Amino acid sequence: MTRANRSKIKPRMEKTTDRKQADRKQIIFTEGAKGGGGKTTLLSSLADFFLAEKIPVKLVDADIDNKARGSLSHLFKGTPKIDIRTDHGLDQFIGMVLDDKAQTVLADLGAGSTKETWAWFEQMHESDSEEGVRFLAIGLVTNDSSTTSAILDWANALQDRVDYLVFNCTS
């Protein structure tokens, strides 16, 4: 029996041949229970990357309580500010996701509106997932222990209906 020399074996890359799978829209949104944890900063950095690389992206500022100069709609002119806690705002958001040509939607969700946001997700998820939309929830862990609890609460509420990306922002 001979052993293959692993250094000479090239990894086989699987290519997505299903265009429908490759063209699926995705909603990337922030999760968290409190403000000031860096969610908007992270999302704006991600938006900067997409725009610099000329990757089409739709930005949505759903953090209606953040009226300061640090909100997503202030940082990126033309970004709609939508209250997803209302039926009209929810319809507006779903319409934007499905009608916009951009494959990716970056949504900055408000802190402190966790239960309302979960209700929003419950209403939105079924109709959007039927359209093939994928979801990515971004959470940030800081030195504040409540950020860890918030991420676990979100995971408990959203379960396996989303993918998760958690950043460790502790020093």
Where are these regions (language model features)?
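Flexible, glycine-rich phosphate/dinucleotide-binding loops
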Residues: G36, N66, S146
